Amino acid sequence: MHATETSLPLVSIIMPAFNGEPYIGAAIRSVLAQSYARWELLILDDGSADRTAEIAEAFEKSDPRIRLFRNPKNLGAAQTRNRGFALAQGEWIALLDCDDIWHTDKLEKQLALASRGDILYCSYALIDESGKHLSDFLVPESTDYEAMLRESVLSCSTVLLRRSILAGQRFPTEYYHEDYVFWLELLKAGYRAIACTEVLADYRLVKGSRSSDKRNAAKNRWLIYR
């Protein structure tokens, strides 16, 4: 696919970035390698103390689809993603953490299911800090509110959201596992979640960071919401 095919829906990719110097380059390159080329990448640096913003800026200069924004202070992942929602122009919104990687056909294969759902997700691989494959997390073809209470299968770097469902919906900032609460809110509102069950993303487990808790994020914390 080519970026000139303007009849295709635009995908806004929101990438929060905080001290991601070792990994952000690989994350951005995985977006550039997508077979589906009609996207914009919004990188939001959240007060990094390393070269994260510098690396992102170099990519911004090389491709007009990439834009870098700097938070005036450290806001945290939830508020940073919410800022990205406000900046996004696409019909679909994707999320990609700066230490994760997409497979080249991720957007194309998920968007092939766009007519069936409002939330599109996929299976993913777990990798370590060096990129070594650890295991696969295979997801069911669909999920709903009750199913998500039993098992969390939606993960930020796998999800595409129809922009129209986000009116008034934002990541809550009062919970530690705000992403899980956010998915529950969308599903409880009746939005349809459909999966491409193929492994289309790599989730990197980084020691000492919240990313090491990705796969089981708040699986049993639904009580705070229910």
Task: Name what the model sees in each region.
Residues 22-25, 50-58, 101, 105:
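Acidic helix N-cap motif at the loop->helix transition within catalytic regions
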Residues 105-134:
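Conserved donor NDP-sugar-binding/catalytic core segment of glycosyltransferases
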Residues 30, 37, 45-54, 73, ...:
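A conserved acidic beta->alpha catalytic loop
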Residues 86, 138-216:
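Conserved nucleotide-sugar donor-binding catalytic segment
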Residues 11-23, 27, 34, 44:
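A conserved hydrophobic helix/loop-capping motif in glycosyltransferases and polysaccharide synthases
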Residues 9-12, 30, 40, 181:
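Cell-envelope/extracellular polymer assembly enzymes that use nucleotide-activated donors
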Residues 93:
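Short aromatic/hydrophobic "clamp" motif used to bind/position activated sugar donors
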Residues 71-88:
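Glycine-rich, basic loop-to-helix element that forms the pyrophosphate-binding segment
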